[in-house]
């Protein structure tokens, strides 16, 4: 089965009214536009999203829905660094340092909390900066992602040479 668009999200439905099968994804797989996966029940699915969300797939995104059957996204828990800033200045410092490493940064549960995938160098940096943090297991859901840049993404436009020798971007 080939999935070309998202249908909605489980949070907008009552999942008890449906038979839900899940595709388990790691946080870093949620930004793939083209991929093959197996559901928990063993169904093969291919994803070729034409209008993929800029932030990536989110927890509960519905990939397939037919009558009472749904296939939805489940983002697996992963090891994360949970960061707790003490001030707005510390938030700026955290965002700068994490961004400078091109690491993913996610909102936490409250205003001054953030999460980033666990990496020893990042943990050492936060310790060196005196930023309060601890390592835990948590979902990194795309809807909570602060950054939308994709350093290795392909351009979304076609460049061609016009007859008047001007570069045209479509």
Curated annotation (Swiss-Prot):
InterPro entries recorded: UreE, UreE_C_dom, UreE_N, UreE_N_sf
Signal sequence interval, chain numbering: none
Record flagged with keyword Heme: no
SUPFAM superfamilies linked to this entry: Urease metallochaperone UreE, C-terminal domain, Urease metallochaperone UreE, N-terminal domain
UniProt xrefs under Pfam families: UreE_C, UreE_N
GO molecular function, one term: unfolded protein binding
GO cellular component: cytoplasm
Keywords: Chaperone, Cytoplasm, Nickel
One GO biological process term: urea metabolic process
Annotated compartments: Cytoplasm
Chief place of localization: cytoplasm
Protein function: Involved in urease metallocenter assembly. Binds nickel. Probably functions as a nickel donor during metallocenter assembly.
Family statement: Belongs to the UreE family.
Name of the featured protein: Urease accessory protein UreE
Organism name: Helicobacter pylori (strain Shi470)
Top-level taxonomy: Bacteria, Pseudomonadati, Campylobacterota, Epsilonproteobacteria, Campylobacterales
């Amino acid at each position: 089965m080939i999935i070309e668009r998202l249908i909605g999200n489980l949070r907008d439905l009552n999942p008890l009214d449906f038979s839900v099968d899940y595709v388990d994804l790691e946080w870093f797989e949620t930004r793939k536009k083209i991929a093959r996966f197996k559901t928990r029940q063993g169904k093969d699915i291919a994803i070729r999203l034409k209008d993929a969300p800029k932030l990536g797939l989110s927890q509960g995104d519905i990939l397939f829905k037919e009558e009472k059957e749904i296939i939805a996204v489940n983002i697996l828990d992963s090891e994360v660094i949970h960061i707790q800033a003490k001030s707005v200045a510390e938030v700026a410092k955290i965002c700068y340092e994490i961004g400078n490493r091109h690491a993913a940064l996610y909102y936490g549960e409250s205003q001054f909390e953030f999460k980033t995938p666990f990496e020893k160098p990042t943990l050492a940096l936060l310790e060196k900066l005196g930023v309060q943090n601890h390592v835990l297991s948590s979902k990194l859901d795309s809807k909570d992602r602060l950054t939308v840049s994709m350093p290795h993404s392909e351009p979304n436009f076609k460049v061609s040479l016009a007859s008047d020798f001007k570069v045209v971007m479509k």
